[in-house]
Amino acid sequence: MHNTLDKSEAKERVTFLRNELHRHNHLYYIKDAPEISDAEYDRLFRELAELEALHPDLADPASPTARVGAPPTGDLATVTRTIPMLSISNAFADEELFKFDERVRRSLQTGDPVTYLAEPKLDGTAVELVYEKGRLVMAATRGDGVTGEVITPNARTIGSVPLHLTGDAVPMPNLLEVRGEVVMTKEGFEKLNALRLERDEPLFANARNAAAGSLRQLDSRVTASRPLTLIAYGIGRFSEIDAISTQHEIVTRLADFGFKTNSHVRWDLDIKGVIDFYRFLEGIRPSLPYDIDGMVVKVDRLDFQRTLGATSRSPRWVIAYKFAASQETTRLVAIDVQVGRTGALTPVALLEPVTIGGVTVSRATLHNEDEIARKDIRVGDAVLVQRAGDVIPEVVQVITGRRTGNETPFQMPATCPVCGTPVVREPSEAVTRCVNAACPAQVKERIKHFAAKGAFDIDGLGDKLVDQLVDRGMIASYADLFTLRVEDLESLDRMGFKSAQNLVAAIEKSRHITFDAFLYGLGMRHVGAHVATLLARAFPGIDQLAEAALAGQLNSIDGIGGVIAESVKNFFSNPENRQTVDSLINHGVALQFPEKEAATGHEMPLAGKTFVLTGTLEKMTRDQARQRIEAAGGKVTGSVSSRTDYVVAGEAPGSKRDKAEALGVAILDEAGLLSLLEPGER
């Protein structure tokens, strides 16, 4: 496309791209308020680089392609570093990584093997820490690579930043400059935003922005209150550099000095091994405690690094292989209001289709009316949409600079968009609800929940089939499912005799159900799978549970708070709900109850013990581990305290392991947990 531009058109386009990239650099580095996604920035940057390559006479030393980032703000003192913190060139496909390998080998012209170190590309804020004779004397942000902002008081508040280097087994250097990434865990980010929501403060768009904003505070007490972690990955100047010959030795030495380093680092890899590791990181990405946006690949030998050198922007011995974008910019064309199984009205953004992470996204959650108002989201807005793993895409930010004046503010409807019943919003809730329990939308969603895994688990009863059954008047309640016959189902779309036969068999099989799955399937508000398990353990049957709930006795059960107790009480106070339960029993639903074992018996080896799970386990998921612990009489909580008996730490355990160590709580690996669950099992 660029080959078709004449000289004046190319010059005009180059000027536009440079101005745009400078503006976005300033918004990203200085204001901590980016307007576009990383992927969109990368596209603009690549377009400019291609144009400059085609028209070398348009080269400019002040071009964004010749610079590392943006200049620092004047609010904090600045420092100029001797060895710049350069940017890293990006790759977006396997082919580009193979070309990188070819360039490296062609430049080195060596008969020695060329191997690589690969590590996750942390999505945080880069910093440099300077140590003299083992003491932290200065910390600075990356800034524009050469000049950074001094943040020493703030860095000292981060628990993972050593104030003094440790390690008796290695000589203490006179000078060491450590490069690392300050990140905020996903859990810490969610808790921080929840706290800011309570205080009516603006929410951070993502953990990276939260980390950057926390580091650049003028008041270090604010930084101290934020859940930040430093993960070290490299060095600048080092007085003992002659004793080190590889990049992986640097990582090992940093760990010896007391720094937290990335547990997912691999070395001695050829380029095919590097690509295999990239696939591995893609797979574990959702389960990591912190955000990563790709993989960094470095030539391992330091003498090879020195031979390869660097351009004005980036080293030639390193490249970042980035994941497919998790954020993209698109336009919000309409807002649809959906009705859930509890009557909650949820606004959903209808978007111009955009590809995020290899998936086409045309809808995104807007959460509720208050979130729309807080973010000032309007129909017609250009918006930043985020998709993380299997999480429903969400609109995280409005790009107000692109508004035309034709955008329309959103207003929640006064009546249910499905059944027309006037909607209600309680003063204490952020949710507007349709109060008509017979609303077809609520009926459909309740039955879908009832039939889902973890509840009645009716194989073959998908969402579209439920919609058909309700729309045709064939079912209106849970119990109606147990009256369906093969001949009834054959008339439905895409439902032949064999499929109908299989579905009837699956419904029949679901009649035999454990008490906890039954309770979960009823769809009581605030009663998820875990709460259902707690309730099922506490009572020998549905009648005893209902009696205790109506008497206000559920608060005495460990793990059941006031909100849950009130919700269960309200459920059983409604005669229609009692009738629903009775109808299911009358239609042959048979509840199964686990045999009660003595708390001290062999079958309940974890009775009275409290566990916290963190990191990625190898032989089972964390949810499976929770189920096994609870089945053995143990209790699983979400946070570490002095009352915790064990922390089970898998790969990339995060801050929970650190807290356990600080409190003296016993830490188990997966094999240790298995030995408690089943002596002799590994």
Swiss-Prot record:
Superkingdom in the source lineage: Bacteria
Pfam families xrefs: BRCT, DNA_ligase_aden, DNA_ligase_OB, DNA_ligase_ZBD, HHH_2, HHH_5, Nlig-Ia
EC number: 6.5.1.2
Keyword Secreted on entry: no
Binding annotation for Zn(2+): 416, 419, 434, 439
GO molecular function, one term: metal ion binding
SMART domains per the UniProt record, alphabetical: BRCT, HhH1, LIGANc
Domain BRCT: 601-682
Protein name: DNA ligase
InterPro entries recorded: BRCT_dom, BRCT_dom_sf, DisA/LigA_HHH, DNA_ligase, DNA_ligase_CS, DNAligase_adenylation, DNAligase_N, Hlx-hairpin-Hlx_DNA-bd_motif
Alphabetized PROSITE patterns for the sequence: BRCT, DNA_LIGASE_N2
Disulfide bond residue pairs: none
GO cellular component: cytosol
Protein task: DNA ligase that catalyzes the formation of phosphodiester linkages between 5'-phosphoryl and 3'-hydroxyl groups in double-stranded DNA using NAD as a coenzyme and as the energy source for the reaction. It is essential for DNA replication and repair of damaged DNA.
Keywords: DNA damage, DNA repair, DNA replication, Ligase, Magnesium, Manganese, Metal-binding, NAD, Zinc
Lineage, top ranks: Bacteria, Pseudomonadati, Thermodesulfobacteriota, Desulfobacteria, Desulfobacterales
Family the entry assigns: Belongs to the NAD-dependent DNA ligase family. LigA subfamily.
GO biological process, one term: DNA replication
Catalyzed reactions per annotation: NAD(+) + (deoxyribonucleotide)n-3'-hydroxyl + 5'-phospho-(deoxyribonucleotide)m = (deoxyribonucleotide)n+m + AMP + beta-nicotinamide D-nucleotide
Active site feature: 121
SUPFAM superfamilies to which the protein is assigned, alphabetical: BRCT domain, DNA ligase/mRNA capping enzyme, catalytic domain, Nucleic acid-binding proteins, RuvA domain 2-like
